[in-house]
C-alpha cells in the first residue's frame, strides 16, 4: 500500500473500515446522508409520515442452544395500513460465523446489513484476520448510531446480531446474541433469547415459556418458529406461516462449522407441525 493510495486517510493510517473509506471518498453514498432532507420531502416536522412512505419489517427472534445460536424472522413488511410484502427476507448471513436480522425501515435496514457484511469482508482483507465477535458487535453499533439522523425522521433500523464466538472457553456457550436500540446502544442477551420488532413483546412472552438452557438445535428452531407464530397471532405487522402460498419464516443456524441457512423444506415441516398442533388443541378445547 503506497503513501498515495486512497485506502489511506493520512500517512501511516490504513482504512480497514469500508464505511470510513466511503465517507472519505463518496460520503453522499452512505445511507443517512441521503435522507437529510426527508422532513421537507414528506412535509413532516417530526418524521410521522415516514412510516407510511417506506415499508417496515418485523419480527426477529434469536435463540441460543447447546453448541450454537440461531436467528429467525417472519416475512411480512407493512407500509402504513398496507401489506407491502409477504415474502421479505429479514435474516442475513454476514460472515462465516455471524448473521444479522433486521427490523424497522426495510430499505435502510437491508442496506445497513449488507454494508455491514462488506465491512467484515473488507476488514479481513485489509488486516489479514477476521474481526472478533465483540469487534463485529461494536462495528454494527456504530453503523446503527450513524443512522440516527434518519431514525429521528421516522426511518429507524433495529438489528439483532448473532454469532459463534470461536474464542469462547466453553463451546456449548459460544453462541452469542446482541441486540441494539435505535441510537446504537448494544446489549448482550445472557438468558438465551431475544426478539425485536413490533411483535417482540408477544414473541418474548412465548420464548419465556418455551425456552430452557441446554436445548438442542432442533428444539431451538421449533420454539423460535413457535414464538413467531404467537407474535403473528396478536400483531398485524408480523406474518405467520402462509400454507396456501408456501411462505414460511427464514432462519440461520450458526455453530462451530459456520453459518448455514435452514432449508425451506425443514422450515415448512416445522411450521406445518406447529399449525397442526395448534389446530388440534383448538378443536380439543372446542369439543370439551
From Swiss-Prot:
The formation of the proteasomal ATPase ARC-20S proteasome complex, likely via the docking of the C-termini of ARC into the intersubunit pockets in the alpha-rings, may trigger opening of the gate for substrate entry. Interconversion between the open-gate and close-gate conformations leads to a dynamic regulation of the 20S proteasome proteolysis activity. One of its GO terms (cellular component) is proteasome core complex, beta-subunit complex. InterPro entries: Ntn_hydrolases_N, Proteasome_sua/b, Proteasome_suB-type, PSB_actinobac. It catalyses: Cleavage of peptide bonds with very broad specificity. Pathway: Protein degradation; proteasomal Pup-dependent pathway. The active site is at residue 58. The keyword Cell inner membrane does not apply. Its EC number is 3.4.25.1. Residues 1-57 form a propeptide. Keywords: Autocatalytic cleavage, Cytoplasm, Hydrolase, Protease, Proteasome, Threonine protease, Zymogen. GO terms for biological process: modification-dependent protein catabolic process; proteasomal protein catabolic process. Pfam families: Proteasome. It is found in: Cytoplasm. SUPFAM superfamilies: N-terminal nucleophile aminohydrolases (Ntn hydrolases). Gene3D superfamilies: Glutamine Phosphoribosylpyrophosphate, subunit 1, domain 1. Coiled coil: none annotated. It is an enzyme of class 3 (hydrolase). Component of the proteasome core, a large protease complex with broad specificity involved in protein degradation. Belongs to the peptidase T1B family. The 20S proteasome core is composed of 14 alpha and 14 beta subunits that assemble into four stacked heptameric rings, resulting in a barrel-shaped structure. The two inner rings, each composed of seven catalytic beta subunits, are sandwiched by two outer rings, each composed of seven alpha subunits. The catalytic chamber with the active sites is on the inside of the barrel. Has a gated structure, the ends of the cylinder being occluded by the N-termini of the alpha-subunits. Is capped by the proteasome-associated ATPase, ARC. PANTHER family: ATP-DEPENDENT PROTEASE SUBUNIT HSLV, METALLOPROTEASE TLDD. NCBIfam families: 20S_bact_beta. This is Proteasome subunit beta.
